[in-house]
Every structure is written in C-alpha cells, then in structure tokens.
A protein has these predicted regions:
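FMN-binding flavodoxin-like domain, especially the glycine-rich phosphate-binding loop
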Residues: 2-3, 16, 20-161
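Glycine-rich phosphate/diphosphate-binding loop of Rossmann-like nucleotide-binding domains
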Residues: 8, 14
Length: 161
C-alpha cells in the first residue's frame, strides 16, 4: 500500500519531522511511504496512495499560509483517503495543537477520513496528530512521537484499505 506525507518547511524542522513520520509508516509490512514538499508533490504517487499525512510549521498559532493555500487549492484526488496531521513549533504553548485542528478541519472539508490515534493505542498519544517542539532541543527529541503517528496511521490504512 502506498502512503504519502506532504509537508511545508521553512527551516528544515518540518521536513525532518516528515521523514520521521514516513519512517514510522514504513515499519508496517507492505507499506511504501514517500514524503513530499508541497513544492514537489508526485501527483501520480499521491493519487494511488490510500492515505496522506500533512505537516506544517506553526506561525502565530496557525498552520503556515503555504500549507493552507496548498490544501485550499490542490486538485489532488484526496476524497475518501485516510488523512492525518502533524505540526512543528518553536514553543510548546505556541499553538501547535491548533495547527493540528486547522489541518484536520481542512481534511474533513476535502472529504478525507481523519485518523485519530486516540488514547486507547497507548503512549505516545497521537489523538489529534503529532506535534514537535524545537525550543531548547531538537526535532529529533520528538522522533518517537512522529514515528508513532506514522506507524499507527499505516496500520489503520492497511486495515481499512
């Protein structure tokens, strides 16, 4: 099964986070996962994918305008795919959880089935998605959460499709 990660990154942190999410997806047998910047999406691959996780940096408690514009204008066939979100931020209280909600709302409006890791899947919890904070540390410090989102998402995609 093909799964995709589509992200926007200004500083490289969201790109690194996307790679961790992709690596988590590939822990599931039979999954081929690829990550794409919004500027270089392989439309054929995403069209064939059963699910897509979107990631964006947090600016003023909102997803980057570039990701918002991408989601609002893309012509990719996303309806009925499994979707999820992750975000990056410089501060724990910087609004990254709001970004997860921003993206999830847009995915619902586009007709995706929004994945929730829920609390029943154990730690780390990824019920709205995954967020990573860079302040005082590195994105690598949140690698396990990002990989967990990718792996949980991939397991559900394989089960559904």
């Amino acid at each position: 099964m093909k799964l995709a990660v589509i992200y926007h990154s200004e500083t490289g942190n969201t790109r690194k986070a996307a790679e961790f999410v992709r690596a988590g997806m590939e822990k599931v047998e039979g999954v081929e996962a690829r990550a794409f910047s919004i500027d270089a999406v392989d439309e054929a691959f995403v069209s064939e994918a059963g699910g897509v996780i979107f990631g964006a940096p947090t600016y003023y408690a909102f997803a980057s305008w570039q990701m918002v514009q991408f989601l609002q204008t893309t012509k990719l066939p996303l309806t009925d795919k499994l979707g999820a979100a992750f975000s990056t931020a410089n501060f724990e209280q910087g609004g990254s959880e709001i970004v997860l909600e921003n993206i999830n709302d847009m995915l619902l409006a586009k007709g995706l089935l929004v994945f929730s890791g829920g609390v029943s899947h154990g730690m780390p919890m990824t019920h709205l998605g995954a967020n990573a904070f860079a302040a005082g540390t590195s994105i690598e410090a949140r690698q396990s959460v990002l990989e967990a989102l990718g792996e949980k998402f991939a397991k559900k995609a394989v089960q559904l499709f």
